[in-house]
Structure formats: structure tokens, C-alpha cells
Amino acid sequence: MTKPQLSYFKVRALGQFPRVLLSYLSIDYDNNYIDKIDENIIDDLKYGQLPLYTDSNGFKLVQSMAISKYIASQHDFVGKTPEEKALVDETLAAVNIDVFTFIIRVFRGVEEKEKIQEIIIPRFFAKWNQILGEKKYLAGGNSYTLADLYVYVAYEYIGYVLPFAADLLYNGKFPHLDSLKEHFESNKGVAEYLKNRPITERKI
């Protein structure tokens, strides 16, 4: 059987969510790094954008969050009850629409970096830290879900893209987020992915 393939640029950005997910779930996949969108791949891109996920059965899917939910749903990683699944969706939307978009806007100079400290950290990261302290898992229940993975990726990513944010977030300031980070990075598949993840000039 053909291995699943994830195609994305040689940067972290939106490709980080499904890459970390596939690694965490120990799915053997082809991590296909793309230099540019050309005629060899454009016909497979419904909206002209990467990432592109090609499953082992030939099914193709674009949009990072849709890809992640599709993979997670195949491996019982989206919550067990309707309430847990709704909380997973709620968290994914907050990460993808609010936090991640804002990080990129600050990185590109569209938003003032002070807003990271004034809005993003107290409204989102502090709240997630609080929930993790109260419930251990962001969607409740008794196991990790895609919600936890998404918050981990955002927590790791913001310090990479915006170094000033690392001083505001890390070093014990949010211990439950630190524990979440430790959980995912101690996973064998994730650790291997992080070890071999390419370093590029485009810090995004």
C-alpha cells in the first residue's frame, strides 16, 4: 500500500500541525517538501494552496485544519463524546483563526507586537494553561486530543517566529503549557521529526 503523503513548503507555518500529528500518531508517511507550486502539483490544489494531503487510498485533501481533523478522526483523536468533539473544534478554531493568524500578522509587521502581550497571551495561552491545570486535557475527557496538539504547536511556534514572545511565555510562566510541550516532545515520533526538521532562512 502506498504511504500517505503530506506536501508543503520547507517551512513550519500551517504544515506544522499535520506534520506533528502524523509523527505523534506514528503514521509512516512521505513528508514531501515543496520549493514552489508548479505544474506538477497545481492541478491537485483545489484552492491553489498548500498543504496537500494524499492518503494511501488516493484521496486528496487541502487546508491544514481539514487535513488534521481527517487524520485525527481516523485514529480516535478528536474526542469521544459530542461535548469533547465540540471543544476540540472550539480550540482548533481559536488556534487557527485567532492565534495563528495574529502571530503571522505580527511577524509581517501588520500588527503591533505589544498586542501579543496585551491580547494573545492573556486571552488564549493563559486560558489554556488554566484549563490544563483544572482538567489536564483541553477537551476534558481522559485522554489527549487534537485540541492539545494544536495548542502545543502554537505554543512552540510563537516562540520560534517571535523570539520576544518566548520571554513572555516560557521558563515556568505557564507550567501546564510547559507540561503539554514536554508530553508531545517526549513522544518518539515527534522527537524524531523535530530532530530532522529542516532549518530554513524563511523563519516562518
Curated annotation (Swiss-Prot):
Broad class of enzyme this protein falls into: transferase
Protein name, entry field: Putative glutathione S-transferase alpha-3
Gene it is expressed from: gsta3
The GST N-terminal domain, residue ranges: 2-79
Species for this entry: Dictyostelium discoideum (Social amoeba)
Catalyzed reactions per annotation: RX + glutathione = an S-substituted glutathione + a halide anion + H(+)
GO molecular function: glutathione transferase activity
Keyword tRNA-binding: no
Residue numbers carrying N-acetylthreonine: T2
GO terms classed as biological process: glutathione metabolic process; response to curcumin
Family, as annotated: Belongs to the GST superfamily. Alpha family.
EC numbers for this chain: 2.5.1.18
Protein role: Conjugation of reduced glutathione to a wide number of exogenous and endogenous hydrophobic electrophiles.
UniProt keyword list: Acetylation, Transferase
Pfam families on file: GST_C_3 (PF14497), GST_N (PF02798)
Binding site for glutathione: Y8, Q49, L50, Q63, S64
Superkingdom in the source lineage: Eukaryota
Stretches assigned to the GST C-terminal domain: 81-202
